Design a protein with these regions (language model features):
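Switch/connector loops and helix/strand junctions flanking conserved nucleotide-binding motifs
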Residues: 14-17, 56-58, 94-96, 112-114, ...
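Conserved P-loop NTPase motor core
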Residues: 107-117
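A short beta-strand-to-loop transition that corresponds to the Sensor-1 phosphate-sensing loop
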Residues: 8-11, 87-90, 134-136
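Conserved segment of the helicase C-terminal RecA-like domain
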Residues: 81, 117, 121-159
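Short secondary-structure boundary/capping segments
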Residues: 20-25, 65, 100-104, 119-122, ...
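Conserved C-terminal RecA-like helicase domain
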Residues: 2-85
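A short beta-strand element within the Helicase C-terminal
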Residues: 91-107, 128-132
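Long, largely alpha-helical accessory region at the distal end of helicase-like NTP-driven motors
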Residues: 164-171
């Protein structure tokens, strides 16, 4: 199964979504499952990959993402797989988890390289999909929405050059 990865440009936006997942999304899943007469998917809480959590919690979250799967044994021992992963730019590098196959990017990242790196975290082992939710009140997001196709057909030419670290040793 999959984990919904939600990418945010700021911790402020992530905090709002965390509250939304903990309250409204859980309630919606319960109501929908009852209406459809099916078992509901249990969401304990959203996991985070951000600078707000400690290194120990980050390691636990990554371990949970990589090792815990849905099974009767895990449910019986109250070990639940991660359903929702809220992340900031920390997810852009070094995260290679097979169960990350669905991503929602809330807003356009400031850098094209960040957009490419973050969106490429899904679909590493199995096919994945990334959705982008633009904010109509932000002119930058609106511009990317209006030029979505042309931007994606040639976005590698928009990648900004990175600066060299001063006093670093030659490669």
């Amino acid at each position: 199964l999959w984990t919904l990865t939600v990418y945010f440009n700021s911790l402020k936006d992530l905090g709002k979504a965390s509250t939304l997942v903990d309250d409204d999304v859980k309630d919606f899943i319960v109501r929908t499952a009852n209406r459809m007469f099916t078992t509901r998917r249990l969401i304990i809480s959203a996991d985070e990959l951000t600078s707000r959590v400690s290194t120990t919690e980050l390691n636990e979250t990554l371990d949970k993402l990589e090792k815990i799967e849905y099974s009767k044994e895990n449910e019986a021992s109250k070990r639940y797989a991660s359903n929702v992963l809220l992340a900031t730019n920390m997810i852009s590098v070094g995260i290679d988890v097979a169960r990350l196959n669905v991503m929602l990017m809330v807003g356009q990242p400031k850098l094209t390289s960040e957009y490419i790196q973050a969106s490429s975290r899904v679909g590493r082992s199995f096919p994945g999909v990334t959705f982008v939710q633009y904010d109509a009140t932000k002119s930058r997001d609106r511009s990317h929405y209006e030029r979505f196709r042309s931007y994606h057909e040639s976005f590698y030419r928009f990648v900004e050059p990175t600066g060299a670290t001063p006093f670093s040793r030659p490669a």
